[in-house]
C-alpha cells in the first residue's frame, strides 16, 4: 500500500516541534509560545477529521517542527542537532512502549478527557493546565521507561514551571508519535525514505 508521506511528514513535524520546545525550555527557560500552544492543543484532539486538524488549520503552525525535521534528517552526531535527534527517537520509543500497554493507553485517554473541566476555567497555557499535562506525563508515560534524559542549563531545569512545560511538551511529542504510527509512519522510513521525507518537509515549508 502506498504511504501517505504528507500525513507522515506532518506527524513527524509534530514530534520534532515537541523536541525543539524541550530543547529551548531546557537551555533558555522559555520557548516559542505559538509553537507551544500548537503542540499542547494537539494533545486534546482525540477525534480529528484529518492529520492536519490535530495541529491546526494550516501547515504554517508546524513551521518550527518542519524546520527541526529538516535539521534532524541532516543531523550531525554532535551538537544541537544530535540532541534533537535523540529527543525525537526517544519519543518514538516511548510511544511504542505506550502502544504495548493497553491499560496505559486507556488511562491516558481518561486523563486527557478529564482536562475539559479545567479548560472551562483556565487557559491552555496557564500554569494549572500545563501542570496537569505534566502530571499525566509523569503518571502515565514515565513509568513505561526508559526515561528521556533532558539536557540543558542545570539552573533552568531546577525551575518547577520549566519542568512542567518540558513534560507537557514531551506529552505532546507522544501524541504526535501516536499519530505518526496511525498514518503509517515507521522508523525504517527515517533510513530508507529519508529523501522523500526531506523533500516533503521542504515543500510544506515553502508553502507555509
From Swiss-Prot:
Its main location: cytoplasm. It is found in: Cytoplasm; Cell inner membrane. It comes from the Bacteria. Keywords: Cell inner membrane, Cell membrane, Cytoplasm, Membrane. One of its GO terms (cellular component) is cytoplasm. Transmembrane segments: none annotated. Belongs to the HflD family. This is High frequency lysogenization protein HflD homolog. It comes from Edwardsiella ictaluri (strain 93-146). The gene is hflD.
Amino acid at each position: 500500500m502506498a504511504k501517505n508521506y504528507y500525513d507522515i511528514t506532518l506527524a513527524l513535524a509534530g514530534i520534532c516541534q515537541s523536541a525543539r520546545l524541550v530543547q529551548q525550555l531546557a537551555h533558555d527557560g522559555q520557548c516559542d509560545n505559538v509553537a507551544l500552544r500548537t503542540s499542547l492543543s494537539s494533545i486534546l484532539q482525540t477525534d480529528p477529521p484529518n492529520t492536519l486538524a490535530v495541529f491546526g488549520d494550516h501547515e504554517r503552525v508546524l513551521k518550527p517542527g518542519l524546520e527541526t525535521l529538516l535539521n534532524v534528517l541532516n543531523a550531525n552526531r554532535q551538537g544541537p542537532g544530535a540532541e534533537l535527534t535523540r529527543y525525537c527517537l526517544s519519543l518514538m520509543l516511548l510511544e511504542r512502549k505506550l502502544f504495548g500497554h493497553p491499560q496505559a493507553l486507556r488511562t491516558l485517554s481518561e486523563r486527557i478527557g478529564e482536562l475539559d473541566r479545567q479548560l472551562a476555567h483556565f487557559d491552555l497555557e496557564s500554569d494549572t493546565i500545563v501542570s496537569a499535562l505534566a502530571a499525566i506525563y509523569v503518571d502515565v508515560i514515565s513509568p513505561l521507561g526508559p526515561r528521556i534524559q533532558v539536557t540543558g542549563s542545570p539552573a533552568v531545569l531546577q525551575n518547577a514551571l520549566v519542568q512542567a512545560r518540558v513534560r507537557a511538551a514531551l506529552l505532546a511529542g507522544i501524541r504526535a508519535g501516536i499519530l505518526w504510527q496511525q498514518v503509517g509512519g515507521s522508523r525504517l522510513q527515517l533510513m530508507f525514505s529519508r529523501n522523500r521525507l526531506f523533500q516533503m518537509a521542504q515543500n510544506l515549508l515553502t508553502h507555509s
